[in-house]
């Protein structure tokens, strides 16, 4: 009968568990079955009133009407969890649903199994709300983008918030090998750029253009772990995630540095294979350029031995340096340092010969003075400097004859030639010569 009375009070619950009632727990002389009809009516009214008002559980300090029995109470149940991780590690609804993301660019739209070490950004709600990815996920980037009829359709608010972002963004392929990570991260960066997140990608100096927001960091983390499973990540990426499993920005920054290093390596190899030297630049500068390239390649894991380096250097030599290809008797065991000793020797010899050439040349001022002291027979005006020149000058033939005979004929002839030309010439008419009238 007492159990029937307790069943009439389902709203009464004190404590954390239902306590059983036995005859040993009742310490009273009053017969528990001896209850008046008026009290039973009061009990019925109280039970009806409690059921109609749907009262909550009273405080633990409340005293039951029957002080001799422990009040039954159901055990407390913790609130349900959205996933296998504590509730304080979950994202808020605002974080999980940022506006403005295009398709494949919404964190709450991506189904995934999170890393075992990363419970922070597990999306709330049942997993059934996330649609499965279409068959294009994990395929090469040349595959056409999925059609809108088979995929999630953005709401009008999401469409209005999108600016330059495409309606459908092609997702990156799935990473399937640690060796493919350098190529995969390039497609992932392209995916972020198409998702209107180019400003958060680190630049050449390792810093992004703008600060990343919490929603963008959530999106970055979720998409990275979806398309790059942890078992296929390189060791250096796992080392970063072991320190901070949300530091995707550091992974991107290191990846960009490696891309630049790879580009520099390719440029160094091309430069080394196309060396050209003919002595137009100092030998020291040429040696510094070549040794820096070789050291940089060796530091990046591309070993260039002496034999290969010497062959590449000698192939680019020209001019006076070209004979080093054939006259060198230590081709097999020659080092880069020994080859540059020969290059320096030729360069110094060239510089010495160039510096000594002006010592053997005549000074232009000396040439002018010498031209005044020597007789030039081709220019009579320069040679004829007779101060006793008369008005009746000799012809060019007579002057030339005088000059030529002045050095060879005896002094008597010179005296006869030096006589005045104004005296008349007497002709001896032995051969009965007749002159024309008026000529004498």
Swiss-Prot record:
Quaternary data: Homotrimer.
Q: Which Gene Ontology terms describe the biological processes this protein takes part in? A: viral translational frameshifting
Q: What induces it?
A: Ty1-DR1 is a weakly expressed element. Induced under amino acid starvation conditions by GCN4.
Residue segments, region Disordered:
1-93, 126-173, 352-440
Alphabetical GO CC annotations of the entry are: cytoplasm
Function recorded in the entry: Capsid protein (CA) is the structural component of the virus-like particle (VLP), forming the shell that encapsulates the retrotransposons dimeric RNA genome. The particles are assembled from trimer-clustered units and there are holes in the capsid shells that allow for the diffusion of macromolecules. CA also has nucleocapsid-like chaperone activity, promoting primer tRNA(i)-Met annealing to the multipartite primer-binding site (PBS), dimerization of Ty1 RNA and initiation of reverse transcription.
Which stretches are tagged as biased composition: Low complexity? 153-165, 402-418
Q: Print the miscellaneous field.
A: Retrotransposons are mobile genetic entities that are able to replicate via an RNA intermediate and a reverse transcription step. In contrast to retroviruses, retrotransposons are non-infectious, lack an envelope and remain intracellular. Ty1 retrotransposons belong to the copia elements (pseudoviridae).
Bias (Polar residues) ranges? 1-10, 48-60, 127-152, 419-428
Query: Which region ranges are annotated with the description RNA-binding?
Result: 299-401
Name the record gives this protein: Transposon Ty1-DR1 Gag polyprotein
Q: Which UniProt keywords apply?
A: Cytoplasm, Phosphoprotein, RNA-binding, Transposable element
Asked if the record carries the keyword Oxidoreductase, the reply is no
Q: List where in the cell it is found.
A: Cytoplasm
Phosphoserine modifications at: 416
């Amino acid at each position: 009968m007492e159990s029937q009375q307790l069943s009439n009070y389902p709203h009464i619950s004190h404590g954390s568990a239902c306590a059983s009632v036995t005859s040993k727990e009742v310490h009273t002389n009053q017969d528990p079955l001896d209850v008046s009809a008026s009290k039973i009516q009061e009990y019925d009214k109280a039970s009806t009133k409690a059921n109609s008002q749907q009262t909550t559980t009273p405080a633990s300090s409340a005293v039951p009407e029957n002080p001799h029995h422990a009040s039954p109470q159901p055990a407390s149940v913790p609130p349900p969890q959205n996933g296998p991780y504590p509730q304080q590690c979950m994202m808020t609804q605002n974080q999980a649903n940022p506006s403005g993301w295009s398709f494949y660019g919404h964190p709450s739209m991506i189904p995934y199994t999170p890393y075992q070490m990363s419970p922070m950004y597990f999306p709330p709600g049942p997993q059934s709300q996330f649609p499965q990815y279409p068959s294009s996920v994990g395929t090469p980037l040349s595959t056409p983008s999925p059609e809108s009829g088979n995929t999630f359709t953005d709401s009008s608010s999401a469409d209005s918030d999108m600016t330059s972002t495409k309606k459908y963004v092609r997702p990156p392929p799935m990473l399937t090998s640690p060796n493919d990570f350098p190529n995969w991260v390039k497609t992932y960066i392209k995916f972020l750029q198409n998702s209107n997140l180019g400003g958060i990608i680190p630049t050449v100096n390792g810093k992004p253009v703008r600060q990343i927001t919490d929603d963008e960091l959530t999106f970055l983390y979720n998409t990275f772990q979806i398309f790059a499973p942890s078992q296929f990540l390189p060791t250096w990426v796992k080392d970063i995630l072991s320190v901070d499993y949300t530091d995707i920005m550091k992974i991107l920054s290191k990846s960009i540095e490696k891309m630049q290093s790879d580009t520099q390596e390719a440029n160094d190899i091309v430069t080394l294979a196309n060396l050209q030297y003919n002595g137009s630049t100092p030998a020291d500068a040429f040696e510094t350029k070549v040794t820096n390239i070789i050291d940089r390649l060796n530091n990046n894991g591309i070993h260039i031995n002496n034999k290969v380096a010497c062959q590449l250097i000698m192939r680019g030599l020209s001019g006076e340096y070209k004979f080093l290809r054939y006259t060198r008797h230590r081709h097999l065991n020659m080092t880069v340092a020994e080859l540059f000793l020969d290059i320096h020797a030729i360069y110094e010899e060239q510089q010495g010969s160039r510096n000594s050439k002006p010592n053997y040349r005549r000074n232009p001022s000396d040439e002018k003075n010498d031209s005044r002291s020597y007789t030039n027979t081709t220019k009579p005006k320069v040679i004829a400097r007779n101060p006793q020149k008369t008005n009746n000058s000799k012809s060019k033939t007579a002057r030339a004859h005088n000059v030529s005979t002045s050095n060879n004929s005896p002094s008597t002839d010179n005296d006869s030639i030096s006589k005045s030309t104004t005296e008349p010439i007497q002709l001896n008419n032995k051969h009965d010569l007749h002159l024309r009238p008026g000529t004498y």
